Each structure stands twice: as structure tokens, then as C-alpha cells.
Amino acid sequence: MANVTVIGAQWGDEGKGKIVDWLADRADAVVRFQGGHNAGHTLVVDGTTYKLSLLPSGIVSGTLSIIGNGVVLDPWALKQEVEKLEGQGVTINDDNFAIADNCPLILPIHRDLDGLREAAAGTGKIGTTGRGIGPAYEDKVGRRAIRVCDLEHLDSLEPQLDRLCAHHDALRAGFEEPPVDRERLLGDLREIAPFVLRFAQPVWKRLKKVRKAGAKILFEGAQGVLLDVDHGTYPFVTSSNTVSGTAASGSGLGPGAAGFVLGIVKAYTTRVGSGPFPTELDDEIGQRLGERGHEFGTVTGRQRRVGWFDAVLVRQTCAISGVTGIALTKIDVLDGLDTVKICTGYRLNNNVYDYLPSHAASQAAVEPIYEEMEGWSESTAGARSFADLPANAVKYIQRIQELIECPVALVSTSPERDDTILMRDPFMD
């Protein structure tokens, strides 16, 4: 049996939470390997809605859930999320939850810097969630980060704080802000340390043991490949690598552990915040899709931008991330449309492109080339087999498969976990 790596193959918000939850029932461990609490998952299990932004989706079903070293961890946000889930009856303890002891922390000073920069950016805003993710990754790469393991050695933290605060004090001075309150920061860390340390361990070692026992591991990506710091629509991206290869470096297992790479893809396209969006719809159809799809961010509450399915982008993300098969979500949102469209190429300066150029100005200027297909009036909501789908919906799915050059493994027809059509079992591949 294979391990499975789940990634978003668009700009995030593709419905990864439902798919991961559906797969987590059969996994022995679920691992978050990048990002922070800036990307949310909404799970609906037996009529109960769970909103997660940091914890792996497997925690709801009691599966061993791990936050890997590739994640930047806000310990206060984690505590709040754990307490909220426990209030909903979810059991969280050191038997079913672990945090990498070499995981870098998001501190209040990171949130401060994030907000100051975005406020000063004016029209140049990149749409950050303001939760300190980017600045925390900067400190990680700059070798200034305070990590989970440091919480056990707070009495000897002064040299690290010197280096960290010298950097942030210089930045804060540029915004006419006072220096970091070191005593308050240290006090905050002392207060939160016992909560975090009860879950801290070398998770690479635990995962090695789990894998050696023949267990199935589910790697849960956050956001989407089009937000990858290298391969996304730069600079309108996140601060981490969101491609499947990060599952190795962000968990401590080798690249051979990734297994079946499942790319999650909406049957249309959405994006939160600024940045290029070739198929964006500003008309009544776009408004209808947004309303029917409840397109509001789990974390920020911001309304998502909506557009037609972009086969060019998904073909590109599937290639970059080595996607084995896709899970197509929210097909039911397209029910009732007379016509559906798929972007098959771009036009730019009298040239036709079968990929998205790297330069930001070119990305913003491309014009989509559409292929139109007949829609369907029948409902796809709740369908659990291909035979339950309208003929035109089947044709739409098959055409997507052809254009992105990657097979469809799953189709999701509602937020409910069991409303899923399985064509190819990722764990059996």
C-alpha cells in the first residue's frame, strides 16, 4: 500500500480538508509539512463543522496527527485551536498529536512586522493574512528563529534573543515603532512553553518507526501550488514551498515516502487576495458560482475571486508537483448552468501560450482562450457513483482529464465526507 501526499493544485481553498478527512480514516498518520495557520480547512463530519487552520485534518477522526518541521508554528493559535476542538468533543493528547521539536515559532513580533509592512505597502499589497507567516520564515532562513526545542532552554536564550531582537529592532525603527519588549516576549514564551512541550518530539524518528511498521502515512499540504514561493504567481505567493516535494524536507522522511501525489482541484477556479487570475469572472455567473460555492476564506473571511476552470494552470501544477491523480471538488456548484467553459490556452502579444509565463506583468496580461461545453440541469449533489452523474457532467470531467494530462482519481459532490466518487484508490496504488 502507498503513502499519499495531498496538495492543492490551484490557489488553495480547493477542498483539501474534506478529501484529507476522507482519506484520514484509512491512514495511520497524518502529517502537516509546510505553511502555518494562514490556510484553513473546513470539515463536515456527521453534520458537525470543524474549522482547522493549523492542526492536521486527521485529528478529528483520532488519527495520529503530526506537525512537521516545515511548518511555522504559532503556539498561541495552536492552543486556541486545540481548546476549541476539545470543546467540540475531539480528544487531543500526546498519543495522537505530535509537534516537531525543530519546528520554528511564530512570535508576536512576526505578526507586528507583517501588519506594519502590509499597512505601508499601499497599492502594492500582496494580500498577506497578517499572521506573521512570512516574517517567521524569514527568521528561519536567516538563522534567527526561536524553535520549539528552545522552549525547554529559556534560561539560556539570551544570545538568540540578542540576534533576533537586533534584526527586528532595526526593522521596527524604520516604521517608527519602539524596540521589541524582550521581557514581555520572554514572559509570553515561559507561559506557553508547558503546553507546547507536552507534544514536542523528534517526529522524523516517530515517522520512521511508523513507516517501518508498514503504516500508511498521509501528508497534508496547505494552500496550493500556484502560491508556491518558487513556482507560484510571484510575488503574490506564500512564503513556503507548497509542492509535493516539500513533504520530504518538511517532515524528515525521504522523498521516496511521498507515495501517491493527489492534487486537489476545484471544478472551477478561485483565488483570495491580489494577483493575476486569467479566468476571473466579474459578471453574474461569477457571483452565482461564488454564492453557490460559499466562497469565503476559512481563516480571513475574505470573499474569494471566482473564475472558470483553467486547464493550463492545472496541467502546469500537476507537472511541477508530480501529481499522480486529481480529486475534482465542487462539481455540484456548476449544476444548472447552460454553458460551462474551460481555459485551454492564453493569448499574449499575438502569441498563444500553453503555460503561464513567469513574469508578473505577463501573467497579468494574458487573455484566456476558452472551450465551451454544454452544461447540465440535473443535480450532481450527493452523487456517489459515476452512474449518478448527468451525461454532460461526465463529459466535462473527462475533458478536464484530457486537457490536464492527468487522471481523475476522485470526484467530490458535496462537503459531506461520504459524497465522494472513487475511480482510483490512492492508498492502493
Swiss-Prot record:
Which terms are listed as keywords in the entry? Cytoplasm, GTP-binding, Ligase, Magnesium, Metal-binding, Nucleotide-binding, Purine biosynthesis
- The active-site annotation reads 13, 41
PROSITE patterns named in the record: ADENYLOSUCCIN_SYN_1, ADENYLOSUCCIN_SYN_2
The cofactor note reads: Binds 1 Mg(2+) ion per subunit.
Q: Which residues bind substrate?
A: 298-304
Q: What is known about its subunit structure?
A: Homodimer.
PANTHER family documented for this protein = ADENYLOSUCCINATE SYNTHETASE
Q: What does this protein do?
A: Plays an important role in the de novo pathway of purine nucleotide biosynthesis. Catalyzes the first committed step in the biosynthesis of AMP from IMP.
| Family membership | Belongs to the adenylosuccinate synthetase family.
Full protein name: Adenylosuccinate synthetase
